[in-house]
């Protein structure tokens, strides 16, 4: 599910993806993504991998149909995700499917004295509220390193990647809090 229209078939093929077994779906709304996953899980016994890029940029239907006032659709996406994940968690597990959700960090903008204190402790928030935090079996925080020494270059000196810091925020499979650096 792609909400950014940024998929490159040539890159996928060079990366080893079998395009004959890939189903590309434009993520038009959060509801559409969740309903499509439910349909696909019910349509086959094959083991499936769902990748959603990205939760942050996929709007809810009320966001599309509503006005530009952010207050008018506050917490709608979080409520949809909470309901969707409670509905899909068991079918995903029963089919041994994988559901990978990419999300972005947003700056936590305080709107009152108490909120300012909270924002000092947690300066970032993720779109979709806490629903996904509870549903995730594994939550990984990736941050790019900025120094030139972290750049990956080819034989001509062109930058082709960079080093990434990875921190395990939550894990039902092992110990949370572990971290490592690797190159992409």
Locate the predicted segments by residue.
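Conserved inter-motif catalytic segment of the P-loop NTP-binding fold
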Residues: 1-83
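Phosphate-binding/switch region of NTP-binding enzymes
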Residues: 74-183
